[in-house]
Curated annotation (Swiss-Prot):
PANTHER family given in the database record: THIAZOLE SYNTHASE
A Pfam short name: ThiG
Active site: K98 (schiff-base intermediate with dxp)
Entry's EC annotation: 2.8.1.10
GO MF annotation list: thiazole synthase activity
Catalytic activity: [ThiS sulfur-carrier protein]-C-terminal-Gly-aminoethanethioate + 2-iminoacetate + 1-deoxy-D-xylulose 5-phosphate = [ThiS sulfur-carrier protein]-C-terminal Gly-Gly + 2-[(2R,5Z)-2-carboxy-4-methylthiazol-5(2H)-ylidene]ethyl phosphate + 2 H2O + H(+)
Residues at which 1-deoxy-D-xylulose 5-phosphate binds: G159, A185, G186, N207, T208
UniProt GO BP: thiamine diphosphate biosynthetic process
Species this chain originates from: Syntrophobacter fumaroxidans (strain DSM 10017 / MPOB)
Identification of the protein by name: Thiazole synthase
Length: 256
């Protein structure tokens, strides 16, 4: 039997985290969240008015059912990310933060140096930090040693829907990590989410692939099933791969 996902001592039954950007409406987002089965919903601090209960995004998220995870999307350096996280806590959010530092607006790749700086500051201030990083096993271990609650390596650039292009590095991170590994960014199809879970990732975070789908609600449900199938396959124990064929039926002793 599977165990729940545990992050910073808090248990979650779902291993699918959901982003809230790019949805056509707050109602479409709300339906997708429900269909996904997710219990963790991340919101960009630059896109919401935390002190406004009528904010179109915040008002669609029932915080009694979902952990609202603020993210520092758009921060270009450590100080900007720290400032955003502090604003969220001052506005009454729980001290959880998805840390994103992306100075390059074209590829949105995370800055490892500034991410490490911001993580160190925020962890010392009592934040539960979930850092978005390149699939760098050394950086992942450094962040874990600092006290990060998870590590969140990218599969491919944010919003690219290209799937897991960093498979070998993510496999090393999974092997070495003692905190949950959440594959984040670039997962464009339920099969990509299943692949991450089959590898042994603890969870995945998906946004664009669901939000821009023709039917976001149906796609959210498909990702939910993909995550569940991948996790079940991992727990069942996947067969080893081979360079040559191996018959599944005997090649001798045929009836004559």
């Amino acid at each position: 039997m599977d165990k729940p996902l545990v992050i910073a001592g808090r248990s979650f039954q779902s291993r699918l985290l959901l982003g809230t950007g790019k949805f056509s409406s707050s109602e479409a987002m709300k339906r997708a969240i429900e269909a996904s089965g997710s219990e963790v919903v991340t919101v960009a601090l630059r896109r919401v008015e935390l002190e406004n209960p009528q904010d179109s995004i915040l008002s669609a998220i029932d915080t009694s059912r979902y952990l609202l995870l603020p993210n520092t999307s758009g921060a270009r350096d450590a100080l900007e990310a720290v400032r955003l996280a502090r604003l969220a806590r001052a506005a009454g959010c729980e001290p959880w933060v998805k840390l994103e530092v992306t100075p390059d607006p074209h590829y949105l790749l995370p800055d490892p140096v500034e991410t490490l700086k911001a993580a160190e500051i925020l962890i010392k201030e009592g934040f539960i930090v979930l850092p978005y990083i390149n699939a760098d096993p050394i950086l992942a271990k450094r962040l874990e040693d600092l006290g990060a609650a998870t590590v969140m390596p990218l599969g491919s650039p944010i919003g690219s829907n290209r799937g897991i292009r960093t498979r070998d590095s993510i496999a090393i991170i999974i092997e070495k990590a003692n905190v949950p590994v959440v594959v984040d960014a670039g997962l464009g199809a339920p099969s990509h989410a299943a692949e991450a879970m089959e590898m042994g990732a603890d969870a995945v975070l998906v946004n664009t692939a669901i939000a821009v789908a023709g039917d976001p609600e149906a796609m959210a449900k498909a990702f939910r099933k993909g995550v569940e199938a991948g996790r079940e396959a991992y727990l069942a124990g996947l067969g080893s791969t081979r360079a040559t064929a191996e018959a599944s039926s005997p090649l001798t002793g045929f009836l004559r």
